[in-house]
Structures are given as C-alpha cells and as structure tokens.
From Swiss-Prot:
This is Enolase. Its EC number is 4.2.1.11. Mg(2+) binds at residues 243, 292, 319. The gene is eno. InterPro entries: Enolase, Enolase-like_C_sf, Enolase-like_N, Enolase_C, Enolase_CS, Enolase_N. One of its GO terms (molecular function) is phosphopyruvate hydratase activity.
C-alpha cells in the first residue's frame, strides 16, 4: 500500500518569476506528496548543479523542461515500486542514477523535488505531520528566526556590499512571540525609512532595500527601529546578524574584498586581514551575534583566522563556504574554520544528505541554520526540517512576501500542535559561544 505508483513533475514559477520544478509522488494507498524546489541568486561555486535549459528564447534560458523530463522519464522509472517510507534508499538510488559528484546529469533541482515529494507522501501515508515523520518523537525545538529586514548586495539595488542585515529575537519566550517582535520591528523600520525619505520597496527576500549611506547607517537605523518598537537590543531582546556574502565582492586575482563592486567609487578595498579587522570592529560596536560568509568561500586561511579571532563571541556561518556538503564541512571542522553551517536543501539535492550535514555539524559542536533561498515558493518544507532536526535556528526572510511568511506560518502551526512540549531556546540556540 505504501509502494510508489507514479511520479510526475511540472514546471512552475518561483518568487522571482523564474521557472522551477514541482514534483508529485503517488502511492498505491492514495497517499500523495508534493515538493517544490527553491533557487538561489548568490550561489557557491561548489553547489550541486541546478539544471536549466539554456534556451534563450524561453524564460531567458532559465527554463527547467530538461529537469522535468529527467523526473518524468528517468527518475520515475527508477523509483516506482519503492516503498515511499524508504527515504534513504530512494535518495541513494537517485544519486547513483545521476552518477556525478554534483548531480549535474539529472540536476539537483530534479532530484530534490522528488526527495521532498517522497517525504511528504510518506508522512501522508502514515497520517503524521511532516516534521514528526522526519524527526520522530523527540521533535520539540522551534527555531530562533534570522529575519532579513534589510537587503543589500546581490539581493537588491541598494549600494551596500553586505547582502543581508538580520534581526534575531533571542530574548523572546516562544516562537509566536519572536515572530511578533520581528513584525513590529519591521513596521517600525518602514516608518523610519519613510520619515527619512528612503525607499520602502522590498527585495527578493522581503526586506527593505533603501539607499543607506553605508553598513553602519544600516545597522544604526535597525537599532532605532528596535527601540521604536519597544524592544531592547542585546541578549535579552533582539540581536543583529549579517550575511556578508563576501564571495560576491571578493576579487580572486587581487585577493582583496572589493566593496566598490556594490558601494561604488571610494568604497573600501580590504585584504583578508583587514576584512577580519573590519568585522571585529562591527562586533565590538554593535550587538551582533551571527555573521554569515564573512570571508570568501575559497579563503580558507581567512576563515581560520576569522574563527580564531571571533569564533568564541559570534556565530560564524558557512554558506557558500560549506554548501551543505559534508566533505567541505568535515574539512572545516578539522581545520577549525567557522563554527556553524547554513543548511540549504538545494545546495546538496536530497533530504538524506541534508540531514547528514546537520548531524555532522551537531556532533562537532557546530550550530546548523536551516535556510531558504532568495528564489522561493509556497513550499514550507524547511520549516518542518528545522523542527524535525531540533536545529534551533531558521533563516527564511523578512516579515513580508507570502513566499517567506508561508514558512513562519507553518512554524506557528507546529508550535501550536506541539503544545507544552514546544521549546523556543532563543539565545541558547547559540550553544557554542562563550559569552
């Protein structure tokens, strides 16, 4: 009854109006699962391959009909007949069928769509919530959200190099309360921006993209919004985080961090040592608790030096640096580079490999932050993954745009369903920091 009888993929649109995949899996019992695949704007060079058609006459070359065909004509034939509950066997079968180290033959987008749909079909068959199916009876921790309320870098037209300015309600007592704090700060920030005559249109992830005078102007404006909303900045209230996305402005030939790429003539050009000094200055000055991709993805010496300098005080998250890949994470652990990993399901391409990366991180004392992509859909699977793994943190955008709010609303439902069992750890989610 739990045997897969049909697998079907179609091309749909993501939050940027670009094509992506939606996959459906059906079983003998009538149980059904659907998965939709996200897409990134700033991508690590070591990520699994997102297969696009390349036909410039259709969706500017971004069509996904090849990936759709791979699901309908190759993957479907291979996994029909499997028990839908055997997630690992199905994921391993797809990896073997692809046969490349980066899923470049079938496409990570094709494989991931199936992987998510299989898990959802299994949960439907067992008549349990997805987070419960994936995580078992010990599922209880609601994630502390990283809320990207100001967009810069590749996610907006704002003249700021850092890609994301985030708030984290670490002092809240429940996820529901944390979400309210974030929403109130978001609206307070909008009011402040209007009063300054700054743009209040939002970027890809729902954050504002105003033309601030620089990084510090952005941080100080957010701090004013926190105060205006009636909260305090710091460990008992709301803390700040950055996604520097440093690989986006790192000049490989000159080996410098060239801020002029986004901030224009006269902006800083920093060596690795100067980049670390700059980040330390910001940490000393502001209530910053997390920095993502503070160094270029291939600047291993820089990462190690940054971790030695700030690793006991601040969460240093590897996104492009680790690309949700256990090989890169294992090296980072061995060389003591970073102390946290960003988890993006489409960087690696299956739920099995995603869970392996989270488990490896936790065993090494690294934190794991489950994350969306800038090109999202209404699919809320990452909310369930965050709770299923007791990850403790989630990064899924600002307090606007349905593609972001869908994840927050799912977390509200989960917290409600868990009732008294639910835990929101807030500042304790940063369990490997010394302060």
């Amino acid at each position: 009854m739990s045997i897969i009888t049909d697998v079907y993929a179609r091309e749909v649109l993501d939050s940027r109006g670009n094509p992506t995949l939606e996959v459906e899996v059906y079983t003998e019992s009538g149980a059904f699962g659907r998965g939709m695949v996200p897409s990134g704007a700033s991508t690590g060079e070591h990520e699994a391959v997102e297969l696009r058609d390349g036909d410039k006459s259709r969706y500017n070359g971004l069509g996904t009909e090849k990936a759709v065909d791979n699901v309908n004509n190759i993957i479907a034939e291979a996994i029909i007949g499997y028990d839908v509950r055997d997630q690992q066997a199905i994921d391993r079968a797809m990896i073997a069928l692809d046969g490349t180290p980066n899923k470049g033959k079938l496409g990570a987008n094709a494989i991931l769509g199936v992987s998510i749909a299989v898990a959802r079909a299994a949960a439907d068959y067992l008549e349990v919530p997805l987070y419960n199916y994936l995580g078992g009876f010990n599922t209880k921790v609601l994630p502390t959200p990283m809320m990207n309320i100001v967009n810069g870098g590749s996610h907006s037209d704002a003249p700021i190099a850092f890609q994301e300015f985030m708030i984290m309600p670490v002092g809240a007592s429940t996820f529901k309360e944390a979400l309210r704090w974030g929403a109130e700060v978001f609206h307070a920030l909008k009011k402040i921006l209007k009063e300054r005559g700054l743009e209040t249109a939002v970027g890809d992830e729902g954050g504002f993209a105003p033309k601030f005078e620089g990084t510090e102007d952005g941080v100080e404006t957010i701090l004013k919004a926190i105060e205006a909303a009636g909260y305090e900045a710091g460990e008992n209230g709301i803390m700040i985080g950055f996604d520097c996305a440093s690989s986006e402005f790192y000049d490989k030939e000159r080996k410098v961090y060239d801020y002029t790429k986004f901030e224009g003539e006269g902006a800083a050009v920093r060596t690795s040592a100067e980049q670390i000094d700059y980040l330390e200055e910001l940490v000393n000055k502001y209530p910053i608790i997390t920095i993502e991709d503070g160094m270029d993805e291939n600047d291993w010496d820089g990462w190690k030096a940054l971790t030695e300098r700030l690793g006991g005080r601040v969460q240093l998250v590897g996104d492009d640096f680790f690309v949700t890949n256990t090989d890169y994470l294992a090296r980072g652990i061995k060389e003591e580079a970073a102390n946290s990993i960003l988890i993006k399901v489409n960087q690696i391409g299956t739920l099995t490999e995603t869970f392996e990366a989270i488990e490896m991180a936790k065993e090494a004392g690294y934190t794991a932050v489950v994350s969306h992509r800038s090109g999202e859909t209404e699919d809320s699977t990452i909310a369930d993954i965050a709770v299923a793994t007791n990850a403790g943190q989630i990064k899924t955008g600002s307090l606007s745009r349905t593609d972001r709010i869908a994840k927050y609303n799912q977390l509200l439902r989960i917290e409600d369903q868990l009732g008294e069992v639910a835990q929101y750890k807030g500042i304790k989610s940063f369990y490997n920091l010394k302060k």
